[in-house]
């Protein structure tokens, strides 16, 4: 009996902030591995989500959105996005269903230098009239350089099957790199820290969310059978610390409640979550601190 062909490869998700890269990856792997919010720069690190079927295994690399850097952290995030193109088999350039803007034009120009196939993926098509979508697709066709132009909705699942089938056509034959039940290459503590940061993004406003970082200090079994997780939320100013803690500790308590629910859903077990808030002045422009909390710039040099 002839052995069934199996394909595998790495696919980078690229695009401006908040275009839906993390939402698409979470939909594809069937579980939250990348956090989402309506605020730009939600994703900071390269995160991989693993999709496995009987035909192929795809490692999707969700990158930070590309934008003009204003700090060491911003610079790190842009380099993380571009470095992800060095060792992938395909690039999915994600855009929203609107006329080509300067940001998308900038990224499209960068992608002309890429040696691997680039797909243009127009997300959020459930929010636009089909006739307008056709005009937008036509304007992107004129840019050239895209092997495929695919309309999808990452929230509604529209066009996802077609996207996966098209990816399969371009992937090389290869082995299954990860177990069928593995959905990310990141350790649990990384995803846990991201889930806590997601709740900060969702519950606080203005500059506070992007002035925060989360580090998991320990994950140990406790006597009561629950998993004990201790984490520190870092902010840049005393005033931000006050906002995170809230009046009478209410905000920090709500962050903890919401985070614990998400973490328990991820890990499938009861969790005792303890949170602390500390001030680390100008941490976003401190290379040694960035490295300490997981932003290792060596791999980007």
From Swiss-Prot:
Q: Which Gene3D superfamilies match?
A: 3.30.300.20, P-loop containing nucleotide triphosphate hydrolases
Q: Where do the segments described as G5 lie?
A: 152-154
Q: Where is this region: G2?
A: 41-45
**Where is the segment annotated G4?**
123-126
Give one GO term, molecular function aspect: ribosomal small subunit binding
Q: Which UniProt keywords apply?
A: Cell membrane, Cytoplasm, GTP-binding, Membrane, Nucleotide-binding, Ribosome biogenesis, RNA-binding, rRNA-binding
Annotated compartments: Cytoplasm; Cell membrane
Instruction: From the UniProt entry, list the residue stretches annotated as the region G1.
Output: 15-22
**Domain KH type-2, which positions?**
204-281
Query: What GO biological process, any one, is recorded here?
Result: ribosomal small subunit assembly
Hey, what's the signal peptide range on this chain?
Answer: none
Q: Residue ranges of region G3?
A: 62-65
> How is it placed in the membrane, per its record?
Peripheral membrane protein
Q: Which Pfam families match?
A: KH_2 (PF07650), MMR_HSR1 (PF01926)
Q: Where does GTP bind?
A: 15-22, 62-66, 123-126
A single GO cellular-component term from the record reads: plasma membrane
Q: Which domain of life is it from?
A: Bacteria
Could you tell me which InterPro entries the record lists for this protein?
A: G_ERA_dom, GTP-bd, GTPase_Era-like, KH_dom-like_a/b, KH_dom_type_2, KH_sf_prok-type, P-loop_NTPase, Small_GTP-bd
Q: Which residues form the Era-type G domain?
A: 7-173
Family to which this protein belongs: Belongs to the TRAFAC class TrmE-Era-EngA-EngB-Septin-like GTPase superfamily. Era GTPase family.
What is the role of the protein in this entry?
An essential GTPase that binds both GDP and GTP, with rapid nucleotide exchange. Plays a role in 16S rRNA processing and 30S ribosomal subunit biogenesis and possibly also in cell cycle regulation and energy metabolism.
How it assembles, according to the record, is: Monomer.
What HAMAP family does UniProt report for this protein, alphabetically?
Answer: GTPase_Era
This chain belongs to the protein called: GTPase Era
Source organism (scientific name): Lactobacillus helveticus (strain DPC 4571)
């Amino acid at each position: 009996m002839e052995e069934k062909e199996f394909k595998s490869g790495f696919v980078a998700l690229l695009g401006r902030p908040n275009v839906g890269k993390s939402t698409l990856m979470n939909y594809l792997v069937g579980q939250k591995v990348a956090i989402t919010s309506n605020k730009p720069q939600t994703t900071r690190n390269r995160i991989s989500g693993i999709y496995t079927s009987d035909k192929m295994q795809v490692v999707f690399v969700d990158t930070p959105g590309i934008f003009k850097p204003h700090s060491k952290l911003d610079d790190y995030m842009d380099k993380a996005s571009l470095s992800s193109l060095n060792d992938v088999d395909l690039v999915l350039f994600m855009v929203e269903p609107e006329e080509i803007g300067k940001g998308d034009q900038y990224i499209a120009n960068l992608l002309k230098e890429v040696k691997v196939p680039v797909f243009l993926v127009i997300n959020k098509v459930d929010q636009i009239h089909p006739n307008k979508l056709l005009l937008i697709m036509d304007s992107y066709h004129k840019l050239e350089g895209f092997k495929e132009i695919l309309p999808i909705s990452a929230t509604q699942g529209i066009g996802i099957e077609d996207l996966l089938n098209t990816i399969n056509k371009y992937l090389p034959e290869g082995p299954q790199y990860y177990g069928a039940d593995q959905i990310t290459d990141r350790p649990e503590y990384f995803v846990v820290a991201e889930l806590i940061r997601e709740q900060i993004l969702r519950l606080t406003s203005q500059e506070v969310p992007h002035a925060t970082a989360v580090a998991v200090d320990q994950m140990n079994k406790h006597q009561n059978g629950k998993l004990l997780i201790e984490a520190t939320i870092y902010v840049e100013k005393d005033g931000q610390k006050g906002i995170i803690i809230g009046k009478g500790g209410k905000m920090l308590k709500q962050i903890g409640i919401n985070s614990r629910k998400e973490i328990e859903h991820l890990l499938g077990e009861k969790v005792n979550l303890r949170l602390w808030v500390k001030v680390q002045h100008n941490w976003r422009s401190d290379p040694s601190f960035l490295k300490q909390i997981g932003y290792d710039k060596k791999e980007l040099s």
